[in-house]
């Protein structure tokens, strides 16, 4: 089967001067609206090409697939891909880079062809390096421009990128997409003390069309702006698009940000390893996350079997690059949790969709008295409450033989100003809400507005004090000999 789709080749060869008609909803109409069955036939042909390429160019994939008894010639159907191609975990990438530093033996281009180096911070262990070739960088820019077009952005719009410019791929991905879109790029950055107040001043002065960052930072920035005497609605933003953490698909969080800024919120973003990370992203008309399957092939799988779950069920997204040549990821397990559907979309795109976005990470889940709890469930519940002050912390502790959950929640200024009775009433409301949502009773402590530290990047809201108990228990056991 020959592949005859708009600018779809391997290696990718996009025309950097191409633009659709300004009135078009779609960048590539055929690729975005073709029947799912037809698209899957194209995807199968591309998977055959990508797998053959990786097997030839990468000792990592050759070794892994030989051990699993898989050869690219075995790939006759998407069922073959799902059942015969072993998944890759992040730990496999770290091991590969320890074995073959610095980029691992899954680098499929000569090191001299590497154009950009990004990676993880390494705060919890060895950092992972992302090597991106020059042609891949161009393809990423084209993919992100196309997806930003679907968000309603157009050449000449001003796009503020308010995220850290360092190893973090989020900021760079948004920037190069905006550049390819021929937008006015406003790479403000983040992470420097006092920068949020300056960002608010600049937004008030420049009046950009769109803002990219994290939901946590957008809420923090709004508070800083108000403290500076500025109204975030005066920034005249039309769109805020986010990645890096759950939030933009949580109705309470999304609605709150939209109300503060008077602008639409769109969720996007999978994994830095999967750059172009906008491969799952909403559109102007469609909420949640569309799986742009002709950029990155997404399967939502049962974490136990790594086989696709039916539409309408939960699982973990597993991603495969269809356009990357430098460090192609083939069946990389995200470790996130989501639900997918193939229901028709308001925008007319025929991709599968994650209607509730990413719930969180599977390893973020904790169990309290037999109930599985996800931090995003607590986020969503609190953001639906009118007297919530905007920040909270989840403290898990060990009392005797039982795990306990304490929720430290800010009340808004109006509630706190009314005194102890109003605070007590709000605490009772939070307790009732969480009992309904989580199915368990939760200890709730109400604290004053702005008493919990904000962040200009990803929020870390879970404090697990059970580690202290485990360490103490281990010391006692060691002392007993």
Question: What spans do the regions from the language model cover?
Answer:
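Nucleotide 5′-phosphate-binding alpha/beta core
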Residues: 1-119, 125-142, 149-150, 205, ...
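Conserved ATP-dependent adenylate/AMP-binding module captured primarily in the ANL superfamily
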Residues: 140-158, 194-207
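Conserved AMP-binding loop of ANL adenylate-forming enzymes
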Residues: 145-180
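ATP-dependent adenylate-forming carboxylate-activation enzymes
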Residues: 186-201, 376
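AMP-binding/adenylate-forming catalytic core of the ANL superfamily
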Residues: 211, 318, 322-438, 457
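Adenylate-forming
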Residues: 217-236, 255-258
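Conserved AMP-binding/adenylate-forming
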Residues: 242, 247-249, 253-345
């Amino acid at each position: 089967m020959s592949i005859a789709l708009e600018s779809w080749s391997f290696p990718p060869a996009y025309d950097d001067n191409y633009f659709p008609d300004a009135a078009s909803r779609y960048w590539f109409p055929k690729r975005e609206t073709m029947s799912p069955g037809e698209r899957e036939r194209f995807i199968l042909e591309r998977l055959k090409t990508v797998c053959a390429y990786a097997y030839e160019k990468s000792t990592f994939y050759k070794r892994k697939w030989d051990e699993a008894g898989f050869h690219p010639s075995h790939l006759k159907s998407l069922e073959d891909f799902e059942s015969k191609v072993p998944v890759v975990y992040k730990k496999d990438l770290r091991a590969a880079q320890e074995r073959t530093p610095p980029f691992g033996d899954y680098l499929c281009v000569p090191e001299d062809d590497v154009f950009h180096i990004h990676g993880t911070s390494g705060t919890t262990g060895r950092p992972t390096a992302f090597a991106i070739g020059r042609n891949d960088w161009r393809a990423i820019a084209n993919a992100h421009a196309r997806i930003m077009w679907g968000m309603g952005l157009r050449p000449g719009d001003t796009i503020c990128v308010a995220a850290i410019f360092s190893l973090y791929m989020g900021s760079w991905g948004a920037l190069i997409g905006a550049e390819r879109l021929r937008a006015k790029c406003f790479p403000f950055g983040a992470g420097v003390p006092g920068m949020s107040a300056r960002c608010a001043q600049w937004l008030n002065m420049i009046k950009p069309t769109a803002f990219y960052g994290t939901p946590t930072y957008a809420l923090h920035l709004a508070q800083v702006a108000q403290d500076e005497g500025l109204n975030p609605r005066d920034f005249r933003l039309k769109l805020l698009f986010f990645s890096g953490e759950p939030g933009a698909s949580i109705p309470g969080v999304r609605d709150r940000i939209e109300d503060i800024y008077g602008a639409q919120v769109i969720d996007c973003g999978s994994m830095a390893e999967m750059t172009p990370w906008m491969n799952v992203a909403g559109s102007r008309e469609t909420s949640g996350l569309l799986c742009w399957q002709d950029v990155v092939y997404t399967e939502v799988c049962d974490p136990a079997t790594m086989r696709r779950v039916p539409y309408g069920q939960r699982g973990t997204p597993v991603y495969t690059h269809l356009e990357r040549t430098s460090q192609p990821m083939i069946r990389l397990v995200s470790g996130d949790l989501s639900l997918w559907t193939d229901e028709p979309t308001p925008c007319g795109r025929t991709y599968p969709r994650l209607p509730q976005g990413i719930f969180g990470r599977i390893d973020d889940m904790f169990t309290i008295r037999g109930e599985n709890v996800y931090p995003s469930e607590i986020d969503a519940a609190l953001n639906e409450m009118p007297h919530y002050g905007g920040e909270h912390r989840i403290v898990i502790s060990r009392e005797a033989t039982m795990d306990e959950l304490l929720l430290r929640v800010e009340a808004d200024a109006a509630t706190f100003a009314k005194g102890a009775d109003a605070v007590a009433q709000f605490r009772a409301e939070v307790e009732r809400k969480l009992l309904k949502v989580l199915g368990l009773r939760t200890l709730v402590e109400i604290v004053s507005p702005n008493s919990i530290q904000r962040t200009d990047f990803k929020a870390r809201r879970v404090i697990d004090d059970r580690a202290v108990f485990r360490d103490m228990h281990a010391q006692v056991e060691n002392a007993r000999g």
